[in-house]
Design a protein with these regions (language model features):
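Short hydrophobic beta-strand element within catalytic cores of glycosyltransferases
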Residues: 276-279, 289
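Conserved acidic donor-binding segment of nucleotide-sugar-dependent glycosyltransferases
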Residues: 291-292, 296-303, 312-317
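Aromatic "clamp/platform" in nucleotide-sugar-dependent glycosyltransferases that forms part
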Residues: 259
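Short glycine/serine-rich donor-binding loops of glycosyltransferases
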Residues: 264-267, 285
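Short alpha-helical donor nucleotide-sugar binding micro-motif in glycosyltransferases
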Residues: 246-251
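A short, well-ordered alpha-helix in the C-terminal region of glycosyltransferases
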Residues: 305, 312, 319-333, 342-345, ...
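Conserved donor-binding/catalytic core segment of Leloir-type glycosyltransferases
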Residues: 138, 172-191, 197-201
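Nucleotide-activated donor-binding/catalytic signature segment of Leloir-type glycosyltransferases, i.e.
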Residues: 222-245
């Protein structure tokens, strides 16, 4: 159960991967999307919505990852639309809030926490309450696990999301004479895009050459980004699958400037394509970003630290290549088959 499905995100990609792998192993999997909330005083709209049926979109509606599961969008958030099941998985805090109120026959509730959302959502108090739910919780990093234990007294199973090595790979790394630095654009301030741009500008101001490569799904026309940065750069809008892989492979360094991440799949994907990683300590990234070993890590919002680490890789080819190789090995430690087996095991244990 999710609260949206159109937006390309690391979390959504991971959830679709888990769901489709479970389906391919013979499990019956259904994918429900919550209805958009209706204001409490609009009883007319609530009545109309309650008379509608679930809208089912074909699997190919998801055009940015492989998917064989129809998307079922609820007309209104009511238990009558949810079938009886063995397991019910909530994802975003909105889904956990709804799922926790459903009767037991809708399935044993698992809350798959992909981020500590109360850090950035407008509905902080509501999100915080969901972490106190007594259901079983799965998290994608020890950083989230520690937050749940320290702030809510809740334990959780850690299931680090792997990278699909059949999709993200690099047959033979080719290094660019002028290093290409890749980063993600996002309009959430905590994604740190502006910090990353400032770090890149500082590196350029100190006389270093680089080619900036930015990708994202928020802006089809990158001109506002060019205007804000004060220079133009290579931009890719909603790259998916092979286009995304080729973009990673063409770059030398991946720059992550987020303030916090539940895990940070874009950095992992880039590392699988043999990019060297320069990142802030986002919390979740510590599953794979080991400072001076698999990445160069600075503190969040530390633009000086980010620019310093970028310069180190621009000036030190041996360090650049060693981080690439060790980072690649680290990412390969995470395996989809093992993760799915662990997930199924958790589900089975809850039913005994």
């Amino acid at each position: 159960m999710v609260n949206q499905y159109v937006r390309i995100s690391g979390g959504n990609r991971a959830l679709f991967e888990f769901a489709n792998r479970l389906k391919s192993e013979g499990h019956e999997v259904r994918w429900f999307v919550l209805a958009k909330p209706i204001k409490w005083y609009r009883w007319d709209k609530k009545i109309i919505a309650s008379m509608k049926r679930v809208v089912t979109a074909p699997p190919e509606t998801i055009d940015w990852t492989d998917n064989a599961i129809p998307i079922e969008v609820l007309p209104v958030n009511h238990s009558k639309y949810i079938p009886e099941a063995d397991i019910l998985v909530a994802t975003a805090w909105q889904t956990a809030d709804f799922a926790a109120k459903l009767p037991r026959e809708k399935g044993v509730l698992f809350y798959f926490v992909l981020h500590y959302e109360s850090l950035w959502t407008r509905y902080k108090s509501q999100a915080l309450k969901t972490y106190d739910l007594s259901c079983q919780k799965i998290v994608c990093s020890n950083w989230i696990k520690n937050n749940l234990m320290e702030k809510h007294g809740q334990d959780a199973h850690v299931l680090v999301i792997p990278v699909d090595q059949k999709l993200f790979y690099c047959d033979k790394k080719k290094w660019n004479a002028t290093r290409r630095v890749c980063m993600l654009h996002h309009d959430y301030d905590w994604k740190g895009y502006e910090d990353g741009i400032k770090a890149v500008k500082e590196v350029i101001a100190q006389g270093h050459d680089l080619e900036l490569v930015v990708f994202g799904e928020k802006l089809k026309d990158p001109q506002p980004l060019f205007d804000a940065a004060g220079f133009e750069f290579e931009y890719h809008y909603r790259p998916a699958r092979e286009k995304l892989r080729k973009m990673y492979v063409s770059c030398d360094i991946f720059l992550c400037s987020s303030w916090y991440e539940g895990l940070g799949l874009t950095g992992m994907e880039a590392m699988a394509c043999r990019c060297s990683l320069v990142t802030t300590n986002t919390g979740g990234c510590l599953e794979y970003a080991i400072d001076e070993k698999t990445a160069l890590v600075s503190e969040p919002r530390d633009i000086v630290g980010l620019s310093r680490n970028l310069i180190r890789l621009l000036e030190d080819e041996a360090l650049l290549k060693s981080l690439s190789e060790d980072g690649y090995r680290k990412i390969n430690e995470f395996n989809w088959e093992e993760s799915c087996d662990r997930l199924i095991c958790l589900f089975n244990e809850s039913l005994t």
